[in-house]
Amino acid sequence: MTFTVIPVPADGAEDVVVGTSGRDEGAVFTGTADGGIFRVSHDGSHVDRVAHTGGRPLGLELDLDGRLVVCDAHRGLLRVDTASGAVEQVADSVRGTRMVFCNNAAVASDGTVWFSDSSTKYGIERWKDDFVQNTRTGRLLRLDTDGSVHVVIDELAFANGVALSQDEDFVCVAESGARTVVRRWLTGDRAGMRDLLCQDLPGYPDNISRGSDGLIWVTIASPKDPLVERLQQGPLTLRRAVTKIPARLQPKPQATVRVQAYDDRGTLVHDLDVPASDNPDGYHMVTGVREHDGRVWMGSLEEPAIAVLDV
């Protein structure tokens, strides 16, 4: 197992997606805190800025035409042409109210976009406040091909990563605050029903994705924190009080590099935990994951770099 860190020219390379056609085939895209969208060559030797969203790009996907679908925490759902750099705002509101924390997406074979809005109360700058207060205002949303946006699931504990099963018979959304991945059935006898793909995860899931191997890959951004768990279950007054103390005194995510993969039955297939001895740069807080042809690409909300694990 070889772990390689590839620097990019800005902080917070939060998610990754692998290009599949033309000049983008095999290249890895990521978005950074300064609004940049970067293309990284497959071997990591070249990094080019291809666009600027004017916001804070988080989750990345590819649409049916090979354009990037970008969840921008500030601007909502965007489409980006990687050849021209053109940025199109697709959706920024739900039921007449602006989104404040568009986070991650998955694109279906018919062009439907499933995506998450982590909170209706706090934006990305105050994600820790939402997490500790356990507001449960996260939502799974659906953008239909006619441009309409619908709420599919609400009252989620920090809705995060989104992925479709290989047969598209269900859609998943990571519930970071509950350490679960929620599954919503789309076809068959269970259509419309909701259950859990996996639960009691060893830490807090962030982005998820379906790999080229058909598995649902799940990031573990930080290990389970007993203090955070207690705070989330405590009185609302206490939870609010904690978010008002100086940031240096608040609970901090523990450093780790860990991703898991589950099959459609919710069986754990891979649990990849990179030891410190293989991570001399201290890369941490993996928030994006993409398995492609046996390589596992990663992004991080905190790092000015992406990483790849050759297994």
Stretches found by the model and what they are:
Residues M1-V311:
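Sequence-structural signature of mature extracellular/luminal beta-sheet repeat domains
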